[in-house]
Structures are given as structure tokens and as C-alpha cells.
Amino acid sequence: MNRRTFLGGLAAIGLQGSMLNVSASPLARMMSPKRKKKVSGRFDEDAVILISDMHVLPNGHTPGYLTRVVKEILAMNPLPRNVIGLGDLANLYGHVEDYECARQLFAPLEEAGINLTLGMGNHDRRENFARVFPEKAVTTRLFDRMVFVVKTPRADFIVLDSLQESPDLGKWITPGAISQEQMDWLRDTLRGYQKPVFVAAHHSLDETKVLPLLRDCPSCCGYLFGHEHRWRTDSPVFQWGKRGILRTMCLPSTGYWGDIGYVQLHLDEDRAVATLHQSEYFFNYPLKEGEERPLQWALNAQDNDGSHCSFSYQRPG
């Protein structure tokens, strides 16, 4: 059956018009983002790159993966105005050498004029981070934590510090937590916030316990986190029986283990749309020379790459 015969049959039963006008339906119009780029010279002011779990170890495998991500970002035209990292910049113990290596790897981004914001994860050490990135540490909103605010024309980002430092420099504390001082600061900051805002941390909502504060801020449109080394999205409800939900997104690792890649977030007029760029999957270390890639690893990366996650600025409920 050719296309003309097929459409003729649809017309005969009254379906052709309804099928061909789907693009004009209210739902279709709602689904189409209102995209009008704010380009300033070489930069897209509405483009944000999100990365996490770099685990930079000099002489390890992770610097090569992070270098690839940096090169891909620099190849974008226009360039994103902001890159935001959500913790575990250092490998395991937050050594100064890890941060020094990371600084060299990130240098091309800052030399290109891209704003770089780096949050804390459970493998970081604040003092060592501040020693290598002093200009970033001084911008923290709280004296004893690394808490940052990134402002863009259409939405802002609050990067919390969920790191719990072990008194033993040879150990780390895996679970995350938000200090009471941060909780109080976040509550005060979000009170009356009118602009769309994302709240982010290294750890998930189960550990940071900030969901009640986000619920009370209608302009909070999403929660971003890392730590799990996997691409994962969700929409937790605030209260059963009510319509309120909050979109959440877990970032992949740039190159340690698990889902490997980064997320490109575009801020449109009425929503933000995240796109996953996943290059591969491996556990718990990359393939050795001559080793065959497991089919499931390849399928994981294939299934995830190009996935989207959208955040409406008008939160339901």
C-alpha cells in the first residue's frame, strides 16, 4: 500500500485530519520548548555543562577521560558560559596533588573564558581544595563550607556542600549531610526566591534531607546530584494525594567507573532541557589492552547516550 492509498483510507474513516494535525495540538505546543538563545559573543549564556565524580588521580586513568570532556566542551560553538562540577574532584583522599592535576586539566576552560564552579564530594578535602583553588574558595557563601551560587540570565544554581570530613586523613566518610548552618542559610536564601533555581549537591536527597526546603520554594525547579556514577532521573512527590513533584537528576562520572560522560543543560524560556553525552560504561576500571568489551557495557552506554531530562520552571502543585 502506498502513502496516497494509506492517507485516502484514513480520510475515508475521518482520521487523516486528526493524525496530520498532531503538531498543532495544545499538547504538542506545550512540549515544544520556547527556545531563544542568548548568545553573547562566543558564549551561549543559557548553556551549562554539568559534571561530577572526576576522581582526578595523577598517573591514573581519570585525567585522560576528563581531558576528553574538556576538549568536547571547547569544541562547542558557541561555548557554554558555565561548567558546574558536583564533587569528588579528587580521587579518594583529597590530596593536594589531585587538585593540582585537576587545575591543569581545567585550565583550558578558564583560559577560554568559561566560568568554572566546583562543589565538594565525599572524597574531597576543603583545605586542600582551597589551597589550589583559592579564588574559588573565597566565593563561598559560608565560612566553613564550600557553598556556591551560579547566576545565569534564566535560572540560578545553588551548589551545597554535603561533604563530611573524616578526622583521619587516610579515610573518607561515604554518606553525605548538610550542616544545620547550611540548612538555615538555604531556607533564608530560598524564601521568596522568584527566579527559577536549581539546588545541587554531591549526594542525593535521601542524604541531604533538603526536600522540605525545596518544597516550600515554588521557584525551585530541580535537584541535581552525583555520587552514584550513573545517569538517573526521578520525580519524587512532596506529599501523597497532592500534585507537587520535583524533578531530580543524577550525573554520570566523567571517567572513574559506571556511566561515563557529562550533561549539557540548555535553559529555555519556560524550561531547562538536559542532554546526556555518554561515551561508555565500565566497572570498576576501564578495559585493559586486548580485553573484549562486554556487550552489556556497550548496551548501557548506547541506551543512555542522548537521553533527555526536562525541568519546567512552573512546578506542579
Where are these regions (language model features)?
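Short, solvent-exposed loop/turn elements at domain surfaces
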Residues: 56-61, 166-168, 257-259, 284-286
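N-terminal export signals
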Residues: 2-28
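Short, glycine/acidic-enriched loop or turn micro-motifs at the edges of active sites
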Residues: 56, 91, 164, 205, ...
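Active-site neighborhood of phospho(di)ester-bond hydrolases with catalytic His/Asp-centered motifs
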Residues: 51-52, 83-87, 116-121, 198-202, ...
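A short C-terminal boundary segment appended to hydrolase-like catalytic domains
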Residues: 266-317
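N-terminal active-site segment of His-dependent metallophosphoesterases
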Residues: 25-99, 191
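Extended active-site neighborhood of metal-dependent phosphoesterases/phosphodiesterases
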Residues: 27-36, 40-42, 95-187, 191-193, ...
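A mature extracytoplasmic/lumenal domain signature
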Residues: 52, 161-164, 203, 278
